C-alpha cells in the first residue's frame, strides 16, 4: 500500500483508462446483442406462425392497448381483417370480441414468449462466447508465444499421458515418470553432487531389473547394493578382500595375447601429459609375463607378482626372452628397466590381493558368466564391490574387471531384445576404461543398458579427455540432473536440460491530463532462454531432479521419495589372507619402491655443489663393509616377521600407492645417468644385492638421515601419473578422436 501522490496518480490514471476502455467494449457488445435479440425474435415468429396470423394478432393486441381510450376517440377506426383471401372490416369492439381475432392474438403472444426465451438464451451464450474469445485474444497478446525448443513441466503424469497416447510408455518408471519404451538401451546419465539422489534412481531401475530377471553388472563402491540385493544362490561377488569373492581366473579369462593386452590397458592406465613410455612399457611387460605364465601348471597370482616384482632384473630378462617385452629389460638399459618396473609396481601390486582366491571354489570368468545368460529364467547379478577403506588399493583390479565385463557384452552376440544392465555410480572413481568410448555406442545392438552416475561433467573430461567425454555423454540419452552447487557445473546442467524459443510480450502505458494521451501499446520480441537457470539447479533439494527424455517430450521436474530396502546380506565379509604370503609380498613391494626411489635419483640433474656431492657419498662409508654379508644370513626369509619391519595391512594400503616415483621422460640418452658401479655402491643399508629389504630399521634410519623429504617428493611425482588432473588434447588412448 502506498499513499504517495505519484503512485496514486499513476494508479488512478491507469484505472480510469481501463474503465473507459472497458465501457467502450461493453457498449458495443450490448448494442450488438440488442439488435441480435430482436432479429432472433423475428426469425422465430416467422418460423412459428403465418403472416396472416401475425398481422391479425398484431391488430388484436393494438386494439387491446387502445381499449381504455376508445371512449375518447370520436371516430372509431375500422380495421381490414384478412381471412384466407377474404377481407372483413371490423371496428375495435368487433375485433376484441371476435373469436378468430382472439385466437390470433393468443397465437402471437405464445409465439412471442417462445421467441424471447430462445433469443435470450442465444444472446447469453453469444455474450459468454464473445467475452471468452476477446479475453483469450487479450491473454495471447500479453503472454509469451512459444515458437520452438523444449518445454518444462513439473507434473510427470502429463508426460506419462503423452507417452501413453503415442504408445511409447514403458513399464520402467522413475517415480511417476515412465521412460520411453526400449530407451533403456540408449543409456542413462545421473548428474549431480554427492547425496543428491543418484543412488535412489539406480535402486528404482535395479528393482525393475530384478523383477524382470535381467542380467546385471553393478559397481558397488560402498557395499550398499550388496546389502540390499545380493542373492547367494544366483549372484556373484568380485571383491578380493571379501570371503564371498568368486575364484576369478586371469588365465581362463584371457585366452589370447590381445586379451592380456586389453586387461593391462585398464590395470595400468595411461599417464597424462607425461611421457607415455613408462606406462606403456609397464603394460607390455605385464601382458607378456601373464601370457607366458598361462602354460605353467603351478601358476598363481602370488607367483605372477613374484615374477614381475620380486626376482632380479636378470631373471626377469630371462623369463621374458623371445617376447616383445624383452627389449624393455635389456641389459644395456638396465636402469630404465628398473624404472619401468617401479612404475609397474605401483599398479600391479593390486594383483597381490587376489592371492588365494583361486581356492574359493570353481574357477570363475566374467566372459563365461555373461555367455550363460538365460532368457527363459531369472539371471544372476555380478557385484564388483569395494569400500571406502580399500577402494584406493583395489581401484586397478576393479577397473580391470569392469572393463572385462564391458567387453564381454560383445561376446554375447547381437540381441536387441535381451537386457544386460551395467550400473556404475561414481564412474570417475575408476581408472579410465579405454574400451568404453568405442563399445558404448554399439552396445544397444547387444542389449546393453548402461546407467552411469557422475558428480560433474568436468570429472568425465578429467578422466577421459574432452572429446571422449563428449562422446560418452552424447550416447546417454535419458538424463537426470540433480543439484550441482558450483556455478559452472550448474550452468552446464541448465544448458543440457534445454532452452525454449518464444516471442516475449511487452506492454507499455501512456497517460496524461488529457484523455487523448491515454493509451496502451503491446508488442512481442523474439527471445531464447534456458528452461531453468543455474540458480534453479543449485537450489534443488535432495531427491529432486530434472529429467530429460529422448524425443519431443518436455523436461520434467521430478521429486522422489526415499524407499528403504531390507538388508538381505552383509555388505562385506573379510577374507582370511595368508599372513606369511602377505608379509613376503609387502617386503617385495617395499624393496621395489626403494629401488624405484634409487632410480628416480639417477634421472635427476647432477648436483653442482661439492658439498652436496660429499653428502651423497656419505652413506657408503659406514655400511659398505656389511653389504656383501647380507644375502648370506640364514634368517633372511624370516625378516618380514621381525618387529622392526612394519607390515602393510591388506585393508590399509594407501600409503604404498605414493611410494614409487615415475620418471617424466622415456629417452635414456637425454638423461644424465650415473655409472652402474656407483649405483651398486650406493645401495642403502638394509637392502640386499637382489633389492630385498633385509633390515627395515637400518634402511629407514638411512632414509630419514639422508633423504628426509624424498618421500613427499616422490609422492608428488607419483600423483602426476594417476588420473587426477588432465590437460585436454593430450590423451593418447583409443577413442579420443571421436
Swiss-Prot record:
Q: sequence repeat positions in this chain?
A: 617-619, 620-622, 623-625, 626-628, 629-631, 632-634, 635-637, 638-640, 641-643, 644-646
Its biological function?
A: Conjugative DNA transfer (CDT) is the unidirectional transfer of ssDNA plasmid from a donor to a recipient cell. It is the central mechanism by which antibiotic resistance and virulence factors are propagated in bacterial populations. Couples the transferosome to a type IV secretion system. Probably forms a pore through which single-stranded plasmid DNA is transferred to the secretion system. Plasmid specificity is conferred by the TraD-TraM pair.
Q: What is this protein called?
A: Coupling protein TraD
Can the keyword Transmembrane be found in this entry's annotation? yes
What residues does ATP bind to? 192-199
**CDD domains in the record, alphabetically?**
TrwB_TraG_TraD_VirD4 (cd01127)
Carries keyword Ion transport?
A: no
What's an example of a GO molecular-function annotation for this chain? ATP binding
Source species of the chain: Escherichia coli
Keywords, sorted A to Z: ATP-binding, Cell inner membrane, Cell membrane, Conjugation, Membrane, Nucleotide-binding, Plasmid, Repeat, Transmembrane, Transmembrane helix
Which residues does the annotated region (10 X 3 AA tandem repeats of [QE]-Q-P) include? 617-646
Q: Subunit arrangement?
A: Interacts with relaxosome component TraM. May form a hexamer in the membrane.
Cell compartments where the protein resides: Cell inner membrane
Domain of life from the UniProt record? Bacteria
Q: Which NCBIfam families match?
A: PRK13700.1, TraD_Ftype
Q: What is the membrane topology noted in the UniProt record heading this document?
A: Multi-pass membrane protein
Amino acid at each position: 500500500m502506498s499513499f504517495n501522490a505519484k503512485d496514486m496518480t499513476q494508479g488512478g490514471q491507469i484505472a480510469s483508462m481501463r474503465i473507459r476502455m472497458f465501457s467502450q467494449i461493453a457498449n458495443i457488445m450490448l448494442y450488438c446483442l440488442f439488435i441480435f435479440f430482436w432479429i432472433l425474435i423475428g426469425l422465430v415468429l416467422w418460423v412459428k406462425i403465418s403472416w396472416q396470423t401475425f398481422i391479425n394478432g398484431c391488430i388484436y393486441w393494438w386494439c387491446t392497448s387502445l381499449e381504455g381510450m376508445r371512449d375518447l376517440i370520436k371516430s372509431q377506426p375500422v380495421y381490414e381483417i384478412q381471412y384466407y383471401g377474404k377481407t372483413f372490416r371490423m371496428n375495435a369492439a368487433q375485433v376484441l370480441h371476435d373469436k378468430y381475432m382472439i385466437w390470433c392474438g393468443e397465437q402471437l403472444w405464445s409465439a412471442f414468449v417462445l421467441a424471447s426465451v430462445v433469443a435470450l438464451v442465444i444472446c447469453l451464450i453469444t455474450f459468454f462466447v464473445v467475452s471468452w474469445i476477446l479475453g483469450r485474444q487479450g491473454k495471447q497478446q500479453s503472454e509469451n508465444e512459444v515458437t520452438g525448443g523444449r518445454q518444462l513441466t513439473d507434473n510427470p503424469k502429463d508426460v506419462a499421458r503423452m507417452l501413453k497416447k503415442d504408445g511409447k510408455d514403458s513399464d520402467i518408471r522413475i517415480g511417476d515418470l515412465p521412460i520411453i519404451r526400449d530407451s533403456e538401451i540408449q543409456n542413462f546419465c545421473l548428474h549431480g553432487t554427492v547425496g543428491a539422489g543418484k543412488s535412489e534412481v539406480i535402486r528404482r531401475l535395479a528393482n525393475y531389473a530384478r523383477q524382470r530377471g535381467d542380467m546385471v553388472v553393478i559397481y558397488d563402491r560402498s557395499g550398499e547394493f550388496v546389502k540390499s540385493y545380493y542373492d547367494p544362490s544366483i549372484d556373484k561377488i568380485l571383491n578380493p578382500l571379501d570371503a564371498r569373492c568368486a575364484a576369478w581366473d586371469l588365465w581362463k579369462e584371457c585366452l589370447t595375447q590381445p586379451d592380456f593386452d586389453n586387461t593391462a590397458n585398464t590395470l595400468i592406465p595411461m599417464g597424462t601429459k607425461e611421457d607415455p613410455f613408462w606406462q606403456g612399457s609397464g603394460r607390455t611387460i605385464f601382458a607378456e609375463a601373464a601370457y607366458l605364465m598361462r602354460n605353467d601348471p603351478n601358476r598363481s597370482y602370488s607367483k605372477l607378482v613374484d615374477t614381475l616384482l620380486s626376482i632380479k632384473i636378470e631373471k626377469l630378462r630371462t623369463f621374458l626372452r623371445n617376447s616383445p617385452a624383452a627389449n624393455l629389460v635389456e641389459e644395456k638399459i638396465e636402469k630404465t628397466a628398473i624404472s619401468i618396473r617401479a612404475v609397474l609396481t605401483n599398479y600391479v601390486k593390486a594383483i597381490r590381493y587376489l592371492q588365494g582366491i583361486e581356492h574359493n571354489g570353481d574357477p570363475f570368468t566374467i566372459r563365461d558368466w555373461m555367455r550363460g545368460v538365460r532368457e527363459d529364467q531369472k539371471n544372476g547379478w555380478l557385484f564388483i564391490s569395494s569400500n571406502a577403506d580399500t577402494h584406493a588399493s583395489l581401484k586397478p583390479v576393479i577397473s580391470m574387471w569392469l572393463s572385462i565385463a564391458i567387453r564381454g557384452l560383445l561376446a554375447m552376440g547381437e540381441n536387441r531384445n535381451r537386457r544386460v544392465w551395467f550400473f556404475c555410480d561414481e564412474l570417475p572413481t575408476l581408472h579410465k576404461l579405454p574400451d568404453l568410448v568405442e563399445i558404448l555406442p554399439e552396445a544397444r545392438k547387444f542389449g546393453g543398458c548402461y546407467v552411469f552416475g557422475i558428480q560433474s561433467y568436468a570429472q568425465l573430461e578429467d578422466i577421459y579427455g574432452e572429446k571422449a567425454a563428449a562422446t560418452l555423454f552424447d550416447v546417454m540419452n535419458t538424463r537426470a540432473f540433480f543439484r550441482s552447487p558450483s556455478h559452472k557445473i550448474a550452468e552446464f546442467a541448465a544448458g543440457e536440460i534445454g532452452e525454449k524459443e518464444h516471442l516475449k510480450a511487452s506492454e507499455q502505458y501512456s497517460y496524461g491530463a488529457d484523455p487523448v494521451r491515454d493509451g496502451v501499446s503491446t508488442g512481442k520480441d523474439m527471445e531464447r532462454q534456458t528452461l531453468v537457470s543455474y540458480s534453479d539447479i543449485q537450489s534443488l533439494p535432495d531427491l529432486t531432479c530434472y529429467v530429460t527424455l529422448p524425443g519431443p517430450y518436455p523436461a520434467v521436474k521430478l521429486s522422489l521419495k526415499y524407499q528403504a530396502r531390507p538388508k538381505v546380506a552383509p555388505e562385506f565379509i573379510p577374507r582370511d589372507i595368508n599372513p606369511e604370503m602377505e608379509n613376503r609380498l609387502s617386503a617385495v613391494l617395499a624393496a621395489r619402491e626403494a629401488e624405484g626411489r634409487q632410480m628416480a635419483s639417477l634421472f635427476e640433474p647432477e648436483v653442482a655443489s661439492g658439498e652436496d656431492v660429499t653428502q651423497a657419498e656419505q652413506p657408503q662409508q659406514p655400511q659398505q663393509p656389511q653389504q656383501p654379508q647380507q644375502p648370506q644370513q640364514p634368517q633372511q626369509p624370516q625378516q618380514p616377521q621381525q618387529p622392526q619391519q612394519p607390515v602393510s595391512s591388506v585393508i590399509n594400503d594407501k600409503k604404498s600407492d605414493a611410494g614409487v616415483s615415475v620418471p617424466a621422460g622415456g629417452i635414456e640418452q637425454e638423461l644424465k645417468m650415473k655409472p652402474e658401479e656407483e649405483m651398486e655402491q650406493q645401495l642403502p643399508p638394509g637392502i640386499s644385492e637382489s633389492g630385498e629389504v633385509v633390515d627395515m630399521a637400518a634402511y629407514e634410519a638411512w632414509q630419514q638421515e639422508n633423504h628426509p623429504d624424498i618421500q613427499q617428493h616422490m609422492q608428488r611425482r607419483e600423483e602426476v601419473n594417476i588420473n587426477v588432473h588432465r590437460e585436454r588434447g593430450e590423451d593418447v588412448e583409443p577413442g579420443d578422436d571421436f
